[in-house]
């Protein structure tokens, strides 16, 4: 879940949507904006290290053991499982409320574990060759399709409607790390929240002061 949130909101969010530029400072305060850079190699280190992020989206999409595969991210990907001589393709819009996973090459016997995102609290279903098999599920866990023989005609569908929720976290971490605030007294931790829609952090426009913000979910 954490990997998914960072990937969607931070790493992908650091890439300019229209042309290749990245941002180093990712401000999230009121009326903040992204300073795009790397027009030249000297402009910011993200011209190099930041570029590497965008070829690694798939790194945590799948994990395997001797007789099982874990689907960790729902993104368009192709997994070539050499040990099983099986190719698995995942097709979906991204970010996805529905994903289709197909065995496109080979045959093998293994279990498939499908991640149930923490935000999937209003419905989650898995269909194997058109038949629903998710009798129960628990967010922040995996649903397992037991070990079976797979072939190139098998199709798994994952349905997970996005939900609105608030994701809370500590604020002023640089102060919390010292345990002191500006008045040199013991620091009381502060908390802030982000309005989320599924794994996506939402933003608002046209607000010039926090007191004017109205949240209705």
Predicted segments with their positions:
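Aromatic (Trp/Tyr) and acidic
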Residues: 1-116, 121
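Beta-strand-rich interaction surfaces with strong enrichment in secreted/lumenal proteins
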Residues: 88-91, 101, 134, 144-148
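Solvent-exposed beta-strand/loop surfaces of large extracellular or lumenal domains
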Residues: 121-146, 166-174
